Curated annotation (Swiss-Prot):
It comes from Bothrocophias hyoprora. GO terms for biological process: ATP synthesis coupled electron transport; electron transport coupled proton transport. The keyword Electron transport applies. It catalyses: a ubiquinone + NADH + 5 H(+)(in) = a ubiquinol + NAD(+) + 4 H(+)(out). InterPro entries: NADH_UbQ_OxRdtase, ND/Mrp_TM. It is a multi-pass membrane protein. It comes from the Eukaryota. Keywords: Electron transport, Membrane, Mitochondrion, NAD, Respiratory chain, Translocase, Transmembrane, Transmembrane helix, Transport, Ubiquinone. GO terms for molecular function: NADH dehydrogenase (ubiquinone) activity; ubiquinone binding. Belongs to the complex I subunit 4 family. This is NADH-ubiquinone oxidoreductase chain 4.
Length: 231
């Protein structure tokens, strides 16, 4: 099932954003005020998805709702039809495609060893799988969108585009980003820190898992260094 989750979060979810980009090309660019209800709905949906993430106890559900919240920002900025907004939407879709797929991969790595996806039962893994903890930290920092990652570039462009269109949107954007940072750190601390609940022998991380995570994060870092490849 994990392969399906990775493909769904990385590719299929972004096809909706691509479809909206193509659809908006035939609509007038000067009448963006008529799309105000849809923009407010997209931003409000992103906040609600983020709040839903905070109350999740299942690791895969948390990552899935995280993908939904990011797509809310993408939809809102596509609708206003500005060059910066479109560039930010493309950047965030590509960056979050890598990030969410990597998080699903790490969730499966954890599940194969603990046989549970409940956050409170997977804690203390930094003592058992220290290298996996490093991957968890990198993936969560990218999900938070810290500089100089591509996620940060995308969210910065989205924030600039929406703020130029309507300064009030900065309140909803700021709240969404704050909650994103909260649940990302909560996910990392819940799965990696604390006293472990595992009593049996746990196998170490395999080379194929390290390779898979490297193939997720290295392209993202390379695109971050040369963003003009996609925007």
């Amino acid at each position: 099932p994990i392969a399906g989750s990775m493909v769904l979060a990385a590719i299929l979810l972004k096809l909706g954003g691509y479809g909206i980009i193509r659809m908006m090309q035939v609509l007038p660019t000067t009448k963006t005020d008529m799309f105000l209800p849809f923009i407010v709905l997209a931003l409000w949906g992103a906040i609600l998805a983020n709040l839903t993430c905070l109350q999740q106890t299942d690791l895969k559900s948390l990552i899935a709702y995280s993908s939904i919240s990011h797509m809310g920002l993408v939809v809102a900025t596509i609708i206003i039809q500005t060059p910066w907004g479109l560039s930010g939407a493309l950047a965030l879709m590509i960056a979050h495609g890598f990030t969410s797929s990597a998080l699903f991969c790490l969730a499966n790595t954890t599940y194969e060893r603990t046989h549970t996806r409940i956050l409170i039962l997977t804690r203390g893994l930094h003592n058992i799988l220290p290298m996996a903890t490093t991957w968890w930290l990198l993936a969560n920092l990218m999900n938070i969108a810290i500089p100089p990652t591509m996620n940060f570039t995308g969210e910065l462009l989205i924030t600039s585009a929406l703020f130029n269109w309507c300064p009030t949107t900065i309140i909803m954007l700021g709240l969404s980003m704050l909650i994103t940072a909260s649940y990302s750190l909560h996910m990392f601390l819940s799965t990696q820190m604390g006293q472990t609940t595992l009593n049996n022998q746990t196998e170490p991380t395999h080379s194929r898992e390290h390779l898979l995570m490297t193939l997720h994060l290295i392209p993202l870092m390379m695109i971050s260094m040369k963003p003009e490849l996609i925007i």
